Amino acid sequence: MALVPCQVLRVAILLSYCSILCNYKAIEMPSHQTYGGSWKFLTFIDLVIQAVFFGICVLTDLSSLLTRGSGNQEQERQLRKLISLRDWTLAVLAFPVGVFVVAVFWTIYAYDREMIYPRLLDNFIPGWLNHGMHTTVLPFILIEMRTSHHQYPSRSSGLAAICTFSVGYILWVCWIHHVTGMWVYPFLEHIGSGARIIFFGSTTILMNFLYLLGEVLNSYIWDTQRSIEEEKEKPKLE
């Protein structure tokens, strides 16, 4: 019985991300017309990651319903592949990148919003859309982690993957600066080269920490759930 609400919830989250992406892309901002377009912003990349992840979740749920009780080994094999892809995407991309975007954005915003989200953007981006991009990502991914168990990859391969993503994005940001002479984020203009190197190194370390945090949190949630279920199954002493 719990499967149906989870399916509906995932569909709702997927539709919300599609709505956010469509509304964001419909905004005519000068930055969208420059080199790299929306793809130079980690927020936009994260939105795409979250939409793809929940799309995989919905597809996995549909496949699970269709293959249940069929006894078709090929369909079950394809379902296992989908589940593995879903779990890998959450572990390596959806959780660490999503939490990173929320945590770093609001930390810098609280210190000085002009360094990350200038007031000028209020003329283009409504408040609800800003929260859709930088706030609701966190509760959505935590809800998913709580409602379904996810098998994390080996720690070495997971950390290697998130490091590859982090370094790849840093190189992309540096390349954009090389081509345009402008940094993607305003605060990078106000710090020296040494501070930028420290910042980029720190972001990579933080991404690795968030990967490990997701792994620990996933284990804690489901070890606790397993313990509760085992306690319920124990015969009650009269």
UniProtKB/Swiss-Prot annotation:
Keywords: Cell membrane, Hydrolase, Lipid metabolism, Membrane, Transmembrane, Transmembrane helix. It is found in: Cell membrane. It is a multi-pass membrane protein. InterPro entries: ADTRP_AIG1 (IPR006838). It catalyses: 9-hexadecanoyloxy-octadecanoate + H2O = 9-hydroxy-octadecanoate + hexadecanoate + H(+); 12-hexadecanoyloxy-octadecanoate + H2O = 12-hydroxyoctadecanoate + hexadecanoate + H(+); 9-(9Z-hexadecenoyloxy)-octadecanoate + H2O = (9Z)-hexadecenoate + 9-hydroxy-octadecanoate + H(+); 12-(9Z-hexadecenoyloxy)-octadecanoate + H2O = 12-hydroxyoctadecanoate + (9Z)-hexadecenoate + H(+). Residues 31-44, 111-124, 180-193 are extracellular. GO terms for biological process: long-chain fatty acid catabolic process. Residues 1-12, 68-87, 145-156, 217-238 are cytoplasmic. It comes from the Eukaryota. Induction: By dihydrotestosterone (DHT). The record marks T43, H134 as: Important for catalytic activity. The keyword Cell membrane applies. Hydrolyzes bioactive fatty-acid esters of hydroxy-fatty acids (FAHFAs), but not other major classes of lipids. Shows a preference for FAHFAs with branching distal from the carboxylate head group of the lipids. Belongs to the AIG1 family. PANTHER family: ANDROGEN-INDUCED GENE 1 PROTEIN (PTHR10989:SF11), ANDROGEN-INDUCED PROTEIN 1-RELATED (PTHR10989). This is Androgen-induced gene 1 protein. The lineage of its organism: Eukaryota, Metazoa, Chordata, Craniata, Vertebrata. The gene is Aig1.
